Amino acid sequence: MSKIVKVLLLAFLAFSQMACSYINSTDDLDNQVDKLLAQMTLYEKIGQLVQKNGDHPNLDKMIEEGGIGSVLNQVNPDEVLRIQRLAVEESRLGIPLLIARDVIHGFRTILPIPLAQAASWNLTLVEEGARVAATEAASQGVRWSFAPMIDLTRDPRWGRIAEGFGEDPLLNGEFGAAVVRGFQSDSLYNPTSIAACPKHFAAYGWAEGGRDYNTANISESDLYDIVLPPFIKVFEAGAATTMTAFNEINGIPATGHAPLLRDLLRNKWNFQGVVVSDWESVTQMEVHGYTQNPKQSALKAMQATIDMEMASTAYETHLKELIADGKIEEKDIDDAVKRILRLKFELGLFDNPYGHTAEFPELLNPKHLNVAKTMAQESAVLLKNSNRVLPLSDDIKTLVVVGPLADAPHDQLGTWIFDGRKEDAITPLQSLKAMAKAKGIELKYHRALETSRSKNIIGKQAILNDVRRADLVLLFLGEESILSGESHSLANIDLQGAQMELVEMVATVGKPVVATILAGRPVTFERVEPMLDAVLYAWHPGTMAGPAIADLLFGVVSPSGKLPVTFPRHVGQIPIYYNHKRTGKPATNETWERLDDIPVEVPQLSIGNTSHYLDYGFEPMYPFGYGLSYSSFQISEVKIEGSKLSVGDKLIVSALLTNTGDHEAAEVVQVYTHQLVGSRTRPVKELRAFQKVLLSPDDSAHIKFSINTNDLGFHNPAMEYVVEPGQYHIWVGNSSEHGIQLSFEIIN
């Protein structure tokens, strides 16, 4: 038994002997909450609505006085135990603290970034990864995580695209729900569970220009049909809490948006969980120009039913005064306190505030590392593979590895890794060296650039000399972890620094060149794409990047990832996304008037024009849902059970998937629909279902999808959710651009 666990056990035994009149296991939860609330002073009630950072200078005093309900960013188990003892043993009522942390994609074992997890299209694996993260975090005293982030975005300039699940409502909802299930397990009371906090409610990913914290001007139809559906999914999965957003939505800051929070979330959706502000977003309403002072900010937040204020001081300073002024009632505070206390009871903090008395699994244990490795493998997307240069041939005798991201243990972890450590990370270079040695391959390495942003190539001649002697070049390109994440947006998403020049230099030799790209967003590299024989997009893969990438390059496993977001050819195409509208002048390759083909002084005409860019056309570099494999697959025998359906019926779609190649591999079968005519124009395609299936060569699998026709609806011009009768197309395929098309009709 570890020293920490022994201390926790002794603390638990001491606490179990304390007399707490409001704890009675025979009472139902509501009675326990009401009994405790009845004993609380107004100061103690307001204290439950206050969350402070772990380094707050008056932390101990506030805890002892009952002035804090939650502490974030404290993960030292000894310190967590110390402050929890202050709350339980020194404050008047002994109400335990709720310890919170941003556990975004792993705790000590770092998983691929969430955008990469979405590229796996494997819900079971992502849920398992969230279980790993929850278990490790809970072992250090954390019982509340500010994740998953389900801010749907169509703009890769936005740095926080790395934290979400891409551009599609279904993917964001399904993967968000998988994380909720993984965090919260079978019960919040499970000591290895942590409360999930889907964020940011809402439209944070709609930031103008992809610039973080920027204004979100969004139509009602996009808000209700694109942005909000993922939140419905995570709340159906039982998410215990949610967090507001920094942005304003059509002129009202999200943290004070009563129509969105009180009227929709609370009253219409009946969400009974805790709503927490983002960091200082309550007092930032004054900076927005929406409130005059912190007192008015506290009023707006309370009217919007914000239960807990993170970091700023409006609640603790002004709520008592607002009650005295008659602006709010004490009942408003009581309602918020009840929700917070209920969560603490559900987490078992009153029964055992000091943690579980049994041993937790070790951080970074083999099972956890294997989950991280598998996820890194399944999330990598093979974008190009000319002449089947991958997997690497057994005939290769010499390899040269080039690029700073081949050996960047910190950067491979990605954004938001508070508790990950670079010394635990295994880099691609380390794993490639080990594999090359085992296979008798000579391997040379050149960093070439100090960082991904460096503008000068180091050792050009030495690189060229080794490339000339090599059978193949492995380039590692991309971006450092600091270039994505919160407040790290980019106007230019090209490969940074001299990376394009590095590709061009290496390609002049004429040897096969394979690029592995590690990044927190889609990056643009069309200029050098023709020079690359293969491109493996590995995102920021986490702790086990090295073993995962080495296995992929050498063919131990086949890539099976699919893009959860559209890759533009040029930043000027943004926003570009698969589920766009058709417009009245849809473009085709035949109607694309190319810039270089326009005659001099040709007259301007409006006849026959279509929606495209003269220089970059209308198509992306790589479409949503796209991803290659070392094998090949055939989808056949696509059928619909019944071509005429009533609203509420199940749309049953089946297909036969066959592995027609020579590698064991997984394929993601995707189902899309399109409503031909509606009371609002409808997207050209919308993802409705998907399955990932692993098959050996020559094996087949019958796949069946059941889609509820109620899910095919949208909000009409009167903002009523409707499923309209009419003709629909349906596609079953392997990306948003390729599939077998059938039709069905919804009748009255």
Question: Where are the model-predicted features located?
Answer:
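Glycoside hydrolase catalytic-domain context in secreted enzymes
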Residues: 17-716, 722-736, 747
